[in-house]
Amino acid sequence: MAVIKMKPTSPGRRGVVKISRDHLYKGEPFAPLLEPQFQHAGRNNNGHITTRHKGGGHKHHYRVVDFLRTKDGIPAKVERIEYDPNRSAHIALVCYADGERRYIIAPRGLEVGASIMSGAEAPIRVGNTLPIRNIPVGSIVHCIELQIGKGAQIVRSAGTSATLLAREGIYAQVRMRSGEVRKIHIECRATLGQVANEEHSLRRLGKAGAKRWKGIRPTVRGVVMNPVDHPHGGGEGKTGEGRHPVDPWGNLTKGYRTRNNKRTQVMIVSRRKK
């Protein structure tokens, strides 16, 4: 994939960097695998904002992606690679030998016409999904399950991958892109290869309006708010925080670790690098 730098014909185009999509399918998505997606603008069922900076954006359907990959032993052929507005990764439409079609996360190097398979007996090839116990140590994997049969939960974004370091008993050690080493049950599944669209991090939207197209609203600094709205607010003229930086609810930010999940703490062998 090529990186396209736009000509500075206007201030809004000057800093735009796009990723070429020439290799992607140009037609409509596969209709039976589409679902309506309703806009909630970050509100919950009470109308309260639970996720800030969300609202607006272009309407689009949700593509139902198969994260379980449970059609074991049935080969599938890649029909096309598509753009998905709901995620940074590209998706591939595959057709199984029994005629069923499903979307999967497209790994790097997967091409139209390639054959993929899932299950314990699947060959060691990019795009195939196997239990971790059947994957060679040192392999690059993505779309990893954290609980047996729950479906892929981590390493699903564009360009991401994890490395299978070792197997000890019923657990395997996997190193994430962040540097964290985590224990995962060997019966959990993972897909071989790296997620495609690795140039996604190089793109630049170039203007505020492009963020609004994505449904992202402005992020306002706390120091320019009133005291009722943020702990950093208030003061006469330009003033600083006057305290250690905190979020709108008073929790320390800028480096303070807030993780509090003792249930899965024992599964982390080495914390992620800062």
Curated annotation (Swiss-Prot):
One example of a Gene Ontology biological process annotation: cytoplasmic translation
Gene Ontology molecular function: any one: structural constituent of ribosome
Matches recorded under InterPro entries: NA-bd_OB-fold, Rib_uL2_dom2, Ribosomal_uL2, Ribosomal_uL2_bac/org-type, Ribosomal_uL2_C, Ribosomal_uL2_CS, Ribosomal_uL2_dom3, Ribosomal_uL2_RNA-bd_dom
Matching Gene3D superfamilies: 2.30.30.30, Nucleic acid-binding proteins, Ribosomal protein L2, domain 3
Pfam families attached to this UniProt entry: Ribosomal_L2 (PF00181), Ribosomal_L2_C (PF03947)
Assigned keywords, A-Z: Ribonucleoprotein, Ribosomal protein, RNA-binding, rRNA-binding
SUPFAM superfamilies: Nucleic acid-binding proteins, Translation proteins SH3-like domain
Ranges for region Disordered: 223-256
Skewed-composition ranges (Basic and acidic residues): 229-246
Entry GO terms, CC: large ribosomal subunit
PANTHER family found in the cross-reference section: LARGE RIBOSOMAL SUBUNIT PROTEIN UL2M, RIBOSOMAL PROTEIN L2
Function according to Swiss-Prot or TrEMBL: One of the primary rRNA binding proteins. Required for association of the 30S and 50S subunits to form the 70S ribosome, for tRNA binding and peptide bond formation. It has been suggested to have peptidyltransferase activity; this is somewhat controversial. Makes several contacts with the 16S rRNA in the 70S ribosome.
Family membership noted in the UniProt record: Belongs to the universal ribosomal protein uL2 family.
Subunit-level organization: Part of the 50S ribosomal subunit. Forms a bridge to the 30S subunit in the 70S ribosome.
Name of the molecule in the record: Large ribosomal subunit protein uL2
